Structures are given as structure tokens and as C-alpha cells.
Amino acid sequence: MGRPSKRIREIAKSLDAAKAYTIREAIDILKKCPPVKFDQTVEVSLKLGVDPRRSDQSVRGTVSLPNGTGKTMKILVFAKGDKVKEALEAGADYAGHDELLEKVNGGWTDFDAVVATPDMMREVGKLGKVLGPRGLMPTPKAGTVTTDIAKAIQELKAGKIEFKLDRHGVINNGVGKVSFESNKLEENIRAFLIAIQRAKPASAKGHYMRSLAISSTMGPGLKIDLRESDLAAKES
């Protein structure tokens, strides 16, 4: 890991490294950090008390953030016939089959989400080396393999995101922009935590949510006191 930038080191001097903040306190600190030339993403990093090596302790799902992500989503749809027209009319940025399959296979990834009709998955599945590492492979569980193309596009445009446990037992996701009002960011973060709580595997024992940190793209990472939130502290 590289050395923190001078900017981060200066910000860190004003923070108590031992303190666990409330969600609202952390948001307010990030918003008061010196501005940069772009609207930073607010990111959540959550360590879970599960074993990522066990298939019965996988944590994965989706959540519709109540205030969106603040990001303009570029959506690619793999479909044929009338579904291509339906996709474009619903707001897809790209829609089609053979030409797009070939383009993605060549390494093109100028999009943020992929939706596919079930009949396209045999071909889309062959793009695993390109889509998989970027978390872009459509799945039925995420609602991105569907015949209801319009609904899937509308949900993604409105702020539906997918979360997935990594090999270290951590979930990392963007949940909004620094420019959002504090209460809207807090609503998004709490909706995100509720979704992860509901996705708790039945086989998971002990404390489920182990630690939580909130950061911005160019800002510090702030430890959150999970006890201040009933939903995060509660063990079911």
C-alpha cells in the first residue's frame, strides 16, 4: 500500500484516530474536507463475520438507494428483436447482440451495468473474463437477467446497486456523492446496511457486522460506531 497523500495526512491531523464516529458525524467531516475538482463518491467498507470460503456464507444482493447514487449510469443491454427497441426506449445507452458481444469481447467496457435477456446468456456467459472481474456480469439474482428489460433499466438508473462479499470478508460500495445533503447520504447508508443485514446467511454465527468505515474518494477513512445504529448492532 502506498503512502497516504499530503492532503490526506493534513486532514488526518485534525481527526482522532481512536474515535468511532456516528454516521452523521462521519458524513459531516467528509463534507468539510478541502474540496477537490470533482464530486467525490462516498464509499462504505463493511467487514462481516462470515467465512468467504464457505458457499453457505456468501453475502450478495441488491439495494435501491432511496436517493440514488449521484452517478449517471451507462447501461448496456444484450437483447434481440423487439427487446432492443424496448431497451433503448427505456433509457439504455447501448442495446443489441452480435456487434456488442464482439466489442466487449475485445475489451470494451465503457458502461456501468449490463442487462441481458435470458436467451442471450449463453453468449454473454462467454464474456466472463471481461465482465466478471469488473462485477458487470448480469445475474438473475441481481435482476439483470430478465425479460422485463424496461424495469431493470429504470431501477438501475434510479439507484439500484449490487453488493457482494469479497475474498477478505469485506463489502465495499459507493453510496452517493459528497454533494448530497447529509440526511440523504445517511438515508442511503442506512438503507445499504439494512439490505446487508437482511442478507445475513443462516449459517453465520456470532457478530455479523464487525466493523464499518466511511470514506470519500480523496478523503480519509472514518471508523463508525456500529452501536449507535440499532440496525447494525442488532444480531438476528
Swiss-Prot record:
One of its GO terms (biological process) is regulation of translation. The keyword Metal-binding does not apply. The keyword RNA-binding applies. One of its GO terms (cellular component) is large ribosomal subunit. It holds the Pfam family Ribosomal_L1. GO terms for molecular function: rRNA binding; structural constituent of ribosome; tRNA binding. It comes from the Bacteria. InterPro entries: Ribosom_uL1_bac-type, Ribosomal_uL1, Ribosomal_uL1-like, Ribosomal_uL1/biogenesis, Ribosomal_uL1_3-a/b-sand, Ribosomal_uL1_CS. Keywords: Repressor, Ribonucleoprotein, Ribosomal protein, RNA-binding, rRNA-binding, Translation regulation, tRNA-binding. Belongs to the universal ribosomal protein uL1 family. Binds directly to 23S rRNA. The L1 stalk is quite mobile in the ribosome, and is involved in E site tRNA release. Protein L1 is also a translational repressor protein, it controls the translation of the L11 operon by binding to its mRNA. Part of the 50S ribosomal subunit. This is Large ribosomal subunit protein uL1. It comes from Protochlamydia amoebophila (strain UWE25).
